[in-house]
Amino acid sequence: MELNTHNAEILLSAANKSHYPQDELPEIALAGRSNVGKSSFINTMLNRKNLARTSGKPGKTQLLNFFNIDDKMRFVDVPGYGYARVSKKEREKWGCMIEEYLTTRENLRAVVSLVDLRHDPSADDVQMYEFLKYYEIPVIIVATKADKIPRGKWNKHESAIKKKLNFDPSDDFILFSSVSKAGMDEAWDAILEKL
């Protein structure tokens, strides 16, 4: 598929099924902890400065945000999880919204699950990965902020993440930096393969 990634726009934000776009376009969902770099990932992948708002305030994305890419596919930005300052009730609401989307959306082709290369995956990261494996949803692990770690230590950090996740070697694992754009081509290859 040829994609003009510059031709991208935020289409709509949705809280539940009735608000989802009603068409056949394939979707790739992006999930990860608050402040893992999801907005930066979207902006880097689409060569845009601030199509997705990067926020210093974690827990800002409270809806599913649908990004139209060249009228051929969509990114769906899922609310960041694991943010402590949000009430338990709010977290449960998000959980239901995310679960409804991930388990019922026919357009969904894969989930890009973002983890921070600098740290071991959190319990939430592990739970998300297990959830996706349980529902047999194709998953691409993207380890962000690779520029913050010396290249010589990438393998060590990658191994630690894979071990903690109980990573399935048939899934894609990509080291990514929105600063250096490392991993951008690999991420696109993995995404397009899933469409």
Curated annotation (Swiss-Prot):
Job description of the protein: Necessary for normal cell division and for the maintenance of normal septation.
Keyword set, alphabetical order: Cell cycle, Cell division, GTP-binding, Magnesium, Metal-binding, Nucleotide-binding, Septation
Keyword Cytoplasm tagged: no
Span of domain EngB-type G: 24-195
Keyword Membrane in record: no
Binding-site positions, Mg(2+): 39, 61
Pfam families the record matches: MMR_HSR1 (PF01926)
Entry protein name: Probable GTP-binding protein EngB
Amino acids binding GTP: 32-39, 59-63, 77-80, 144-147, 176-178
Gene3D superfamilies: P-loop containing nucleotide triphosphate hydrolases
GO biological-process terms attached to the record: division septum assembly
PANTHER family the record matches: ENGB-TYPE G DOMAIN-CONTAINING PROTEIN, MSS1/TRME-RELATED GTP-BINDING PROTEIN
Listed cofactors: Mg(2+)
